[in-house]
Amino acid sequence: VIDFYSNPDNRYSVPTQCGWEEIVTVKPFGNLIAKFDTGNARYSVLHAENIKVNGKKITFTNNNKTITTKVIGEYTSITGGGKDERYLVDLDFEFANTNYGKITFGLDNRDDFNTDVLLNRKTMRMLNVMVNPQRKYVITTKFESE
């Protein structure tokens, strides 16, 4: 038992507390406000407008920046508002000055929400954070989004 736990690969590190709202960086869009959602979302979601698909490429706009990238899949999101078809893309992601490489986002128009990004539990496990539902901006500051 001691040998097993003496190997750092066999230990879980204690998650860092974060607020339910923090600033993240999604390249090439820059710093965006994200909701850390402990619900059942299958994928993290990124706000997208003017979505146009041409074969295996997708063009969309976020934060007045338009990009074209590869579609890696599609899925049906079932929410309180009904069913919604969403495209999946991989984008570079940073949080708290750490680059996590590419993560998968579903694209959706989030105009009716206060945040451009919704992070699911899978992404939060990768970030090794636990959400304090009483707090916002524990790790980052809202000023980073301006």
Where do the protein language model's features map onto the residues?
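Pepsin/retropepsin-fold aspartyl endopeptidases
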Residues: I2-E146
